[in-house]
């Protein structure tokens, strides 16, 4: 668990209002078959937390350690998750990116994702 969180922290995904250990535990209780890590030389270098609610797929905590970015690991992990979602009948995969994360925006555009004309809303139901 700590190795996964280290990837998230190094990539800058963790936030003070989200407890990453609780997020991992919650995912382990819900569609744990859609939570993946990428490993290179026995070290976790990438993570992806996919989900499917019967209408849309979602991707969270997608991260690749900086020293392994632009090497194809992220694309390979993303495509693997996409194939699993297609097998489950998922017609579309959605994800959210912080507006200032230009590298992620460029990555997703390069692998065929388009910006949707939507506004994202959220409401915290359980405090971490």
Predicted regions and their residues:
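Acetyl-CoA-dependent GNAT
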Residues: 1-61, 65, 80, 84, ...
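Charged catalytic carboxylate motif
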Residues: 3, 76, 103
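Residue-level recognition of specific faces of alpha-helices
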Residues: 58-61, 96, 107
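Active-site acidic-Proline motif in GNAT/NAT acetyltransferases
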Residues: 65-71, 99-100
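Conserved acetyl-CoA pyrophosphate-binding loop and the N-cap/start of the following alpha-helix
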Residues: 68, 72-80
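Conserved GNAT acetyl-CoA-binding A-motif
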Residues: 78, 85-97
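Conserved beta-strand-loop-alpha-helix junction that forms the acyl-donor binding cleft
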Residues: 95-104, 122-127
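Conserved active-site tyrosine of GNAT-family acetyltransferases
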Residues: 108, 113
């Amino acid at each position: 668990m700590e190795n996964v969180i280290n990837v998230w922290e190094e990539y800058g995904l963790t936030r003070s209002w989200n407890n990453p250990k609780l997020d991992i535990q919650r995912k382990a209780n819900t569609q744990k078959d859609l939570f993946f890590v990428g490993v290179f030389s026995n070290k976790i270098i990438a993570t992806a937390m996919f989900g499917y609610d019967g209408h849309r797929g979602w991707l969270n905590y997608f991260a690749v350690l900086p020293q392994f970015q632009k090497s194809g690991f992220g694309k390979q992990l993303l495509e693997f998750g996409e194939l699993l979602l297609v097998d489950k009948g998922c017609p579309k995969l959605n994800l959210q990116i912080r507006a200032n994360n230009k590298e992620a925006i460029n990555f997703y555009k390069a692998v065929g994702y388009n910006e949707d004309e939507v506004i994202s809303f959220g409401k915290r139901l359980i405090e971490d």
